[in-house]
Amino acid sequence: MPEAAAASAAGLPARGTLLAFDFGLARIGVAVGELETRHANPLLTVHEEANAARFAIIARLLDEWKPVALVVGLPGHLDGREHELAPRCRRFANQLHGRFGIPVHLVDERLSSAAAERQLHDAGLSGWQARKPVLDAVAAQLILQHFLDLNAHAPA
């Protein structure tokens, strides 16, 4: 069962790979990071809308990267209210845990997409069409980096 949005890394080993997901109805951004280096990178964006196709891609990623845990962004509003997509993100996290048996951590993702937009713009990707293919993967990277930063001093 996914943990609360407090994003505790309790019980994680000192080393290992993490995969993070920026869940959306049309796309899912995916990022990869390492516990030892505490660094995250964008990986890819899943453009499939059908659940079976999405989970087939995710299964291949899990087989390839062999993560010790997963991180799913949980959207919220700036005033603390839950975003309308939050229940779907929780369901996605529960499905990941149920299908694959890997620990799943939920982490606050407020403003991750806006920050990803800024980061891509600052990197010289001008125009929505240039940023769109990588936006969700960069948002997943920011979610995972936030999780790693929150737990930088957590005992392994």
Curated annotation (Swiss-Prot):
Coiled coil (residue ranges): none
Cell location: Cytoplasm
InterPro entries membership: RNaseH-like_sf, YqgF, YqgF/RNaseH-like_dom, YqgF/RNaseH-like_dom_sf
Source superkingdom: Bacteria
One Pfam assignment: RuvX
GO cellular component terms, semicolon-separated: cytosol
CDD domains in UniProt: YqgF
Documented EC number(s): 3.1.-.-
Any one GO MF annotation of this record: nuclease activity
Keyword terms, alphabetized: Cytoplasm, Hydrolase, Nuclease, Ribosome biogenesis
Record-level GO BP terms: rRNA 5'-end processing
EC class of the enzyme, as a word: hydrolase
Main location: cytoplasm
NCBIfam families the record matches: RNAse_H_YqgF
Similarity remark: Belongs to the YqgF nuclease family.
Function: Could be a nuclease involved in processing of the 5'-end of pre-16S rRNA.
Record's protein name: Putative pre-16S rRNA nuclease
Native source species: Azoarcus sp. (strain BH72)
